[in-house]
Amino acid sequence: SVAAGNAAWALGERSTAIGNNAHSEGYGSIAMGREASALSTQDGDKKNVVAIGDDAQATGSRSIALGVSAQAGTLERVRDRSVYKDNPELITKLKAQKEVTDAVAIGSEASVQENEGLALGSKATVNNVRGVALGANSATAAPVSTASETINGLQYNYAGGTADSTVSVGNNSTKRTITNVAAGRVNAQSTDAINGSQLYGVANAVGNVAKSTKNILGGNA
């Protein structure tokens, strides 16, 4: 284990703490930055937690927090009188409040509070299992499944009707366009994204049908 910095602690085999008051606990845990905290409480290969950045926090298994105040899970610091290297001392230990597995938070104050989530961007937030938040201030919401819809009395069933999780590029008040999207496949089983030119083509086709109908029937048909 390696500890470098004022009041830095590295507790656990192959753990590393670098920075003023940086704390790492658990096998292979890494904390780098002022008051960075990395806590692994798992066994076997479910270890190796990384927190890099001032006040960054990571806990659980294989979770990563990169950035000032980034969080993959949440921790608290508690004062504890323990025996470390045969010397009784009052030390600060880490206690997990929320552990997450395989979570990644990248960006200042980015936060992931559920397993397998990804938050990328300043203050990006994930609160859903396997959720993805892309861009500053983006936040995930609960996934919504849409298996079918009824339009003018006719039911249409959709491919990919069950949503496993969700990807967000904004939040309730901040919206973003997604540009440079290639044309997706259009068929009954397609789950591709559709771009604007394809919708324009559909609108033109519908308009041509309406125009042909009017020409055949005449009047205001």
Predicted features, each with a name:
Residues 1-180, 184-191, 197-204, 208-212, ...:
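Glycine- and small/polar-enriched repetitive beta-structure motifs of secreted/surface proteins
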